A protein has these predicted regions:
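A short, conserved structural fragment
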Residues: 54-64
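Short acidic, hydrophobic short linear motifs in intrinsically disordered regions
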Residues: 23-33
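Key DNA-contact positions within bacterial/archaeal DNA-binding proteins
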Residues: 44
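Short alpha-helical segments that sit at the start of domains
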Residues: 1-23
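Short helix-coil junctions and helix-kink-helix linkers
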Residues: 31-41
């Protein structure tokens, strides 16, 4: 049996962690995904898949001063 591609795994986990109302930063999303996955996930990995989800239109990017937040659309 083939394993699920990492892209599909991480995008599903990120969408499960994100909220429709409350925006979250990359570190908060990383902690949530790490908790659900049961192992530490790199900040760069989360950022990579967040940018992919943003480009697909599943996630909205919010700029608040120096902070970059994300929420589900």
């Amino acid at each position: 049996m083939a394993r699920r591609p990492y892209r599909q795994l991480f995008e599903t986990l990120i969408l499960n962690v994100l909220d429709n109302v409350i925006p979250m930063n990359v570190e908060a999303i990383r902690r949530g995904v790490s908790e659900k996955l049961g192992r530490e996930v790199s900040w760069n990995t989360i950022k990579k898949y967040l940018e992919s989800l943003r480009d697909d239109g599943s996630v909205e990017e919010i700029h608040t001063g120096k902070l970059l937040l994300y929420k589900r659309k």
